[in-house]
């Protein structure tokens, strides 16, 4: 977390937490979608 704050000194903890949450949810959604496509294709 300290490394992120060093890279983005203007970002406070709330913005960084929201951004990380959005990225994590997007990756989770994409992996879930690909898993469903694999199941549907079989």
UniProtKB/Swiss-Prot annotation:
It comes from the Eukaryota. GO terms for cellular component: chloroplast thylakoid membrane; cytochrome b6f complex. SUPFAM superfamilies: PetM subunit of the cytochrome b6f complex. It is found in: Plastid, Chloroplast thylakoid membrane. Pfam families: PetM. The chain crosses the membrane at residues 19-37. Keywords: Chloroplast, Electron transport, Membrane, Photosynthesis, Plastid, Thylakoid, Transmembrane, Transmembrane helix, Transport. GO terms for biological process: photosynthesis. InterPro entries: PetM_cyt_b6/f_cplx_su7 (IPR012595). Belongs to the PetM family. HAMAP family: Cytb6_f_PetM. The 4 large subunits of the cytochrome b6-f complex are cytochrome b6, subunit IV (17 kDa polypeptide, PetD), cytochrome f and the Rieske protein, while the 4 small subunits are PetG, PetL, PetM and PetN. The complex functions as a dimer. This is Cytochrome b6-f complex subunit 7. It comes from Thalassiosira pseudonana.
């Amino acid at each position: 977390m300290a490394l992120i704050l060093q890279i983005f000194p203007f970002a406070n903890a709330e913005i960084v937490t929201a951004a990380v949450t959005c990225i994590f949810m997007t990756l989770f959604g994409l992996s879930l979608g690909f898993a469903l496509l694999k199941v549907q294709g079989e």
